[in-house]
């Protein structure tokens, strides 16, 4: 009675579990090979990314300039020379080379009553800047969407005084890019815009 129809334990292991064990071992080898190949591909990708030079974002565009006098109906803007200035002034206009949102800040005091308009695009109406102290003081901030080839400049109208005789105290213009966008390659602005000789 002992052992009728029941195989001994040693025979059961030899007959049934060995093929299953070989299948698991083969499956583990295949999975390990795939993992190893995946790790190798990831390593190669990381090495290629580190070896290639990263795309350099253009610096944030900014300008701080003094508004000192009036010339030909426009306020004269002279930029301070330092390493933080990334924009330039041409013909009393701040040249925009990169698309994006910009904050424009203007302050100053005048000895006469004046009206100032902010211009930045040829086909748009200028922004009439509100004045304080009977048109003699200005503290103005605006956020504008500017694009490549735009020019920021200020026109002034003084009812009782010629432009060249306006007296300006503590005038300052600050233009700072808030959101980076498309930037024209260096030198492209000079070749695409007609310059007016002084």
UniProtKB/Swiss-Prot annotation:
Cytoplasmic-side positions: 1-28
Extracellular face of the membrane: 51-198
Main location: membrane
Domain of life: Eukaryota
Matching PROSITE patterns: THD_1 (PS00251), THD_2 (PS50049)
One MF term in the entry's GO annotations: tumor necrosis factor receptor binding
GO CC terms in record: cell surface; extracellular space; membrane
Residues of this chain annotated as glycosylated in UniProt: 91
Membrane topology: Single-pass type II membrane protein
Residue intervals passing through the bilayer: 29-50
Domain THD: from-to ranges: 59-176
GO biological process: acute inflammatory response; blood vessel development; CD4-positive, alpha-beta T cell costimulation; cellular response to lipopolysaccharide; cellular response to nitrogen dioxide; cellular response to prostaglandin E stimulus; cholesterol metabolic process; defense response to nematode
Subcellular location: Membrane
Keyword Disulfide bond set for record: yes
Key words, A-Z: Cytokine, Disulfide bond, Glycoprotein, Membrane, Signal-anchor, Transmembrane, Transmembrane helix
Record PANTHER family: OX40 LIGAND, TUMOR NECROSIS FACTOR LIGAND SUPERFAMILY MEMBER 4
Identification of the protein by name: Tumor necrosis factor ligand superfamily member 4
Species lineage: Eukaryota, Metazoa, Chordata, Craniata, Vertebrata
Gene this chain is encoded by: Tnfsf4
């Amino acid at each position: 009675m002992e052992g009728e129809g029941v195989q001994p334990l040693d025979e059961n292991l030899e007959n049934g579990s060995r093929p299953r064990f070989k299948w698991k071992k083969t499956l583990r080898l295949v999975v390990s090979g795939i993992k190893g190949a995946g790790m190798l591909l990831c390593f190669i990708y990381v090495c290629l990314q580190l070896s290639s030079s990263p795309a350099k974002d253009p610096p944030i565009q900014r300008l701080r300039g003094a508004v000192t006098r009036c010339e030909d109906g426009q306020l004269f803007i002279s930029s301070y020379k330092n390493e933080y200035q990334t924009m330039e002034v041409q013909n009393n206009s701040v040249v925009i080379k990169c698309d994006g949102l910009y904050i424009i800040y203007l302050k100053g005091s005048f000895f006469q009553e004046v009206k100032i308009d902010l211009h930045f695009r040829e086909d748009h109406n200028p922004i009439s800047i509100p004045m304080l102290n009977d048109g003699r003081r200005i503290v103005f901030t605006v956020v504008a969407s500017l694009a490549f080839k735009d020019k920021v400049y200020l026109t002034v109208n003084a009812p009782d005084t010629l432009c060249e005789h306006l007296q300006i105290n503590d005038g300052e213009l600050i233009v700072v890019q808030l959101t980076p966008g498309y930037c024209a390659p260096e030198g492209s602005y000079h070749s695409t815009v007609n310059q007016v000789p002084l």
